[in-house]
Amino acid sequence: MAMKAVCVLKGDGPVQGTINFEQKESNGPVKVWGSITGLAEGLHGFHVHQFGDNTQGCTSAGPHFNPLSRKHGGPEDEERHVGDLGNVTAGKDGVAKVSIEDSVISLSGDHSIIGRTLVVHEKADDLGKGGNEESTKTGNAGSRLACGVIGIAQ
């Protein structure tokens, strides 16, 4: 049975958006789509973080969701956090149209992202290839512009 989820992204500044998730079968890939507005033109890191806690803004969401204790990487890499979804690209109009299919995240089971926080970052994610320690943790993606808790949808 298909599962669906949704996340409304908000931050302290102009960045906001709505991201949808759908998984047709429990061990199948998750489709991720939607749009984010108010971004600077270019690439922005896009990750699922550990906690669904936004009590202190996006900071209380903790680190990237990483139940397998791996190093940070890109969405196509074998060595990656479960929450590593790479980058979204904003055009000159500040809008990023998101369309991703990922086989590591899930809407159920051990890798479920339900109840966790989705974050869009200030800078591009270097996908763990930045050559320093921070790269292997965060991809040097910078501050958290907007976030929201991923919830079950109809």
Swiss-Prot record:
Gene Ontology biological process: auditory receptor cell stereocilium organization; embryo implantation; glutathione metabolic process; heart contraction; hydrogen peroxide biosynthetic process; intracellular iron ion homeostasis; locomotory behavior; muscle cell cellular homeostasis
Gene encoding the protein: SOD1
Cellular location(s): Cytoplasm; Nucleus
InterPro entries, alphabetized: SOD-like_Cu/Zn_dom_sf, SOD_Cu/Zn_/chaperone, SOD_Cu/Zn_BS, SOD_Cu_Zn_dom
Protein name per its UniProtKB record: Superoxide dismutase [Cu-Zn]
Binding of Zn(2+), residues: 64, 72, 81, 84
Any one GO molecular-function label of the UniProt entry: zinc ion binding
Lipid linkage positions (S-palmitoyl cysteine): 7
Gene3D superfamilies (UniProt xref): Superoxide dismutase, copper/zinc binding domain (2.60.40.200)
Keyword Cytoplasm attached: yes
